[in-house]
Amino acid sequence: MAKGHTKRSYSQRYAKWQAKFNAFSNPTVASTILSNVAPVAQQNFQTNVPTFTAVNENVSAVLSQYGITGPNRAIYQGFGLKIARALNRIGSGPALVNMINGLKSYYISAFNANPQVLDAVVNIITGSPTGYVS
């Protein structure tokens, strides 16, 4: 599941800030924060779950095509989620290409990942084997 920064509107950011700010005037800060922030967090979760579920399903299909089984699937699933998060955070363009190239180098050297499979994962997520979407 996605962790970290996802695109949020200013009204979503303000709603979360207001819920946290109002909670600090209450002696039971932790429970108040959680109860006030829960609706905003649930909405964000429901908004982003379909995107990242689709990424997992699409990457899984690519891995099946390449015959990758067992624990090695986790390597490529993790790579796919990182690419999807980067696309969600920074959008397409040169910054995404740089991020993808860095992640590919890391996954190849650290996990001995197959560059062809990594390219296929990038292609299924961004629509381009290089990650550059114009």
Swiss-Prot record:
UniProt-recorded Gene Ontology molecular function terms: DNA binding
Transmembrane segments: none
Gene3D superfamilies: 1.20.58.800
Record's keyword terms, sorted: Capsid protein, DNA-binding, Helical capsid protein, Virion
Stored InterPro entries: Sulfobus_virus_coat_C (IPR022014)
Any one GO CC term of the record: helical viral capsid
Domain of life: Viruses
Broad class of where this protein is predominantly found: virion
Location within or outside the cell: Virion
Subunit description: Homodimer.
Function: Self-assembles to form a helical, filamentous nucleocapsid. The capsid proteins wrap around the DNA and maintain it in an A-form by non-specific desolvation and specific coordination of the DNA phosphate groups by positively charged residues. This certainly protects the viral DNA under conditions such as the extreme desiccation of its host.
Domain description: The N-terminus projects into a DNA groove.
Protein name from the UniProt record: Putative capsid protein
